[in-house]
Amino acid sequence: QAIDHTGLDVERNYHRYRRPLSPIIVRFDAETARDETAFAKFISDLTGARVEFSSSREESVEQLVARATGKVRWLSHEAAPQTALLAKGVSLDKRPIAQRGDIEVPRWLLEQSVCITYHRYGNINGGPKPVCPGLK
């Protein structure tokens, strides 16, 4: 849901969160708490963001880097391949899982601000009338 906090008559400033287009890879190992991986699955179900889990037992770091395209959430205690992922343009989040949903959930989504101007050179309703699906 998009929200306009400004309430201006001549402009709409929407703030919304969108699901990422590519899946988020969540890396974990034997030392990662089950609660963390369960919470990652819960957030995936809540937000609709696609999540792929990567275990250090089943996939090497090099294999993970080779297939990563969007974002990697690193819950593993092994060293994160930060340079290799950033060189591919892949976002890496090494922070621990936050206990508060208002802090944790936005980390799994894309933040977007949409501004629609309803004036042209000071003339209200004189500008273009763009249509943006999902905004009212």
Cite the ranges covered by each PLM segment:
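C-terminal segments
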Residues: Q1-K136
